[in-house]
Amino acid sequence: AARRIVRAAATVFACLLLFAGCSRPSWTEAERASLRGLSLSSLPPLPPDPSNAVADRRDAAELGQRLFFDPRLSANGKVSCAHCHQPALRFTDGLPLGQGLGPLERHTPSLVGAAYSPWQFWDGRADSQWAQAIGPMEHPREMGLARTEIVRRVGEFYGDAMRAIFGSFPILEDRARFPADAAPREDDPRAREAWEAMAPEDRVTVDRALARTGKVIAAYERQLLPGPAPFDR
């Protein structure tokens, strides 16, 4: 019995030594500084976007939010920017691969904090948020509208609001001058032919209006910033 007591005491002592060795680590100040540097709270202010004069305007962001959630800016009237970038899912879609009008080849990236990146899309092919914002609208398997039709619909639904911000925005009522299927797309010869048949000044008008559409959406997306994560606490 005495041996059992001694053996039990030795076991308890060994456990105490083990737990003592597993106590909370003591961080050096240098280590703490390194950890603080990984916190989202250490992010600097958003860098300016010199290519977007309305990037930080509240009225532009509010209008951009309306466009972001509007499925009328798609070929079937059912797909909005928010279709793939859902607020409840951290502005992703929760799917392995994106799904717009058709299946896509890549996972939908989050828009949270995207304003900090100088490059947009997985391959970095856009160098601004506003250039990224207009890409899915023209993509045949995302929102699927031709360039002229995007501008026509934005002018119809939001023309007054766009003019209040930019001073001008076209109403493309003349379908002979502005065909609904005209776009400078390499993968659609018919759309490209219709685009190249337009007068150069009309193409400039459409391009400028499309860029302005992207810029108000980017003003909204610029407000999607990360909050504190459990690591930060």
Where are the regions that the model predicts?
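Bacterial N-terminal signal peptides
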Residues: 8-20
